């Protein structure tokens, strides 16, 4: 049975057909509508899936935000704009006439990355560092989603009680400091207004402020990982996302994690499926009927 997998992110929409063998084919991508209105998202999703839907028997969605009763929610409403409470499952069922499931994108990616691990690993955590910071937890070989879909939203744990206010309403969340948006928000002077991609480029060119911003992000993530190790006793942590996979970033996280007491050390791995983990994880969950 073929699954039409869809990944809804802050900057892009992706879709692909995924067979029972887990192979990704006919992958398509569009920018996430800038207007962030329900109408714009529905139109973009229609354009994305219309060439693929005839070849699939079901739809599996991995989306930013919390998925509750098939609709979009978020701890940080800024990540969704006008899409809060968007009826995601209902919309795709109407567009495709196919049975549809939906799950948070980081939870989906965690499941895909877990399947790719070698060895006898039953407990792992996936962290995505991108526009925001999200995650997914596998414990005892099972993906934790929670009754309200909140499990794994580790970007909203406390990093600095005196830090910036996060869009979720808390002060000093990991996401407000370590994410691409957090990196950009802290930029000053000639870097003010630059996005995270530009800041990484400038860091590679030797810009001291840019390097400090990236180190601040990596140090914050390392402390989060130490907390995760203490909380879950996971066997490894897999890091993905556009910031997490940026050149040199994971090495910085490893450097700062090594400065923590040995009990909080854990193996760090770069995401195996990189930017397709959400697509594949949603399809795998649909195939296993685990939602």
Curated annotation (Swiss-Prot):
Family from the record: Belongs to the ROK (NagC/XylR) family. NanK subfamily.
Binding annotation for ATP: 5-12, 132-139
GO terms for biological process, alphabetical: N-acetylneuraminate catabolic process
Biochemical pathway: Amino-sugar metabolism; N-acetylneuraminate degradation; D-fructose 6-phosphate from N-acetylneuraminate: step 2/5
Catalytic activity: an N-acyl-D-mannosamine + ATP = an N-acyl-D-mannosamine 6-phosphate + ADP + H(+)
Superkingdom of origin organism: Bacteria
Keyword set includes Lipid biosynthesis: no
Role this protein plays: Catalyzes the phosphorylation of N-acetylmannosamine (ManNAc) to ManNAc-6-P.
Alphabetized PROSITE patterns for the sequence: ROK
Record's keyword terms, sorted: ATP-binding, Carbohydrate metabolism, Kinase, Metal-binding, Nucleotide-binding, Transferase, Zinc
Residues engaged in binding Zn(2+): 156, 166, 168, 173
Name used for this protein in its record: N-acetylmannosamine kinase
Gene name as annotated: nanK
GO molecular function, one term: zinc ion binding
Complexes and interactors: Homodimer.
UniProt EC number: 2.7.1.60
């Amino acid at each position: 049975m073929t699954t039409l997998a869809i990944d809804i992110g802050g900057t892009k929409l992706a879709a692909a057909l995924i067979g029972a063998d887990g192979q990704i084919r006919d992958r398509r991508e569009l920018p996430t509508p800038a207007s962030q209105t329900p109408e714009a998202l529905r139109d973009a999703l229609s354009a994305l899936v219309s060439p693929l839907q005839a070849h699939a028997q079901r739809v599996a969605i991995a989306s930013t935000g919390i998925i509750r009763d098939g609709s979009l929610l978020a701890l940080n409403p800024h990540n969704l704009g006008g899409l809060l409470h968007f009826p995601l499952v209902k919309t795709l069922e109407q567009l495709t006439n196919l049975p549809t499931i939906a799950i948070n994108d980081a939870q989906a990616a965690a499941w895909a990355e877990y399947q790719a691990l070698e060895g006898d690993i039953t407990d792992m955590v996936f962290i995505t560092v991108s526009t925001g910071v999200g995650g997914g937890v596998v414990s005892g070989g099972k993906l934790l989603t929670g009754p309200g879909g909140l499990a794994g939203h580790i970007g909203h744990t406390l990093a600095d009680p005196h830090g910036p206010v996060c869009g979720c309403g808390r002060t000093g969340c990991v996401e407000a400091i370590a994410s691409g948006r957090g990196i950009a928000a802290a930029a000053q002077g000639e870097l003010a207004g630059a996005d995270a991609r530009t800041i990484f480029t400038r860091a590679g060119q030797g810009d001291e402020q840019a390097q400090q911003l990236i180190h601040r992000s990596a140090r914050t993530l390392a402390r989060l990982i130490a907390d995760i190790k203490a909380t879950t006793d996971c066997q490894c942590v897999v890091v993905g996302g556009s910031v997490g996979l940026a050149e040199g970033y994971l090495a910085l996280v490893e450097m700062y994690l090594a400065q923590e007491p040995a009990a909080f050390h854990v193996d760090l791995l770069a995401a195996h499926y990189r930017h397709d983990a959400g697509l594949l994880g949603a399809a795998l969950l649909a195939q296993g009927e685990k939602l």
